[in-house]
Amino acid sequence: MTTIQPAPMAFFTNRPTTEIARDLLGTHLLYTSHQGTLGGLIVETEAYMGAQDTAAHAYNGRRTPFSEPLYHEPGTIYIYQLRSFFLFDIVTQAVDQPQGVLIRAIEPTHGLAQMQRNRPNKPSVNLTNGPGKLMGALGIHDKQLTFKNVATAPLTIDLANRRQPRHITTAPRIGVNAKAASGQLPYRYFITGNPYVSGTLKKDWDREQHGWL
């Protein structure tokens, strides 16, 4: 692998958050810690559109200590807890425009053995095929990286070694209120046929190329 190129703040602004969510597919999510560098190719994302999005933490301009990171500069890390899981959201758009992208799944490429130790007895795709699962595999179990920026943090997006998807599927987001105004909007993006996408059926997997060109 060539030198890592962390995504700059400019990557996360000056275009729609939906476009950013699509563009993150095929980039590497990497985390460097005492365990080494762990991570993989991003294969599934969800866009959250801020104050007008009924599924967003900042819906109606809600601003609390919990959601404060969303109001910071583009590329800010927003880690939050959902039950026993920690989830990773990247802030998009300019300061005080609280939009973001949730990283839902990755295909492991770095430190697979260590990720398997971090999530023992989770074979094959179950290791990282969900937003909480991938964070556990990376060994992230707290919010300490929140407010840091992926441009300089040990948790980063590598733009230099990306892969191109053959096809991207759009769909409604998972786990949101489907009856709310934004509930059925197609703000979820994933690599068609990739086995690590959450909730996919084995019959739909591309077992040879995993959906990559």
Swiss-Prot record:
GO MF annotation, one: DNA binding
Keyword annotations: DNA damage, DNA repair, Hydrolase
Protein name: Putative 3-methyladenine DNA glycosylase
Known EC number: 3.2.2.-
Gene3D superfamilies: Methylpurine-DNA glycosylase (MPG)
Pfam families: Pur_DNA_glyco (PF02245)
Transmembrane parts of this sequence: none
SUPFAM superfamilies per the UniProt record, alphabetical: FMT C-terminal domain-like (SSF50486)
HAMAP family given in the database record: 3MGH
Any single biological process term in GO: base-excision repair
Family under the similarity heading: Belongs to the DNA glycosylase MPG family.
InterPro entries on file: Formyl_transferase-like_C_sf, MPG, MPG_sf
Keyword Hydrolase recorded: yes
Source organism: Latilactobacillus sakei subsp. sakei (strain 23K) (Lactobacillus sakei subsp. sakei)
EC primary class: hydrolase
Keyword Nucleus in record: no
Annotated coiled-coil segments of the chain: none
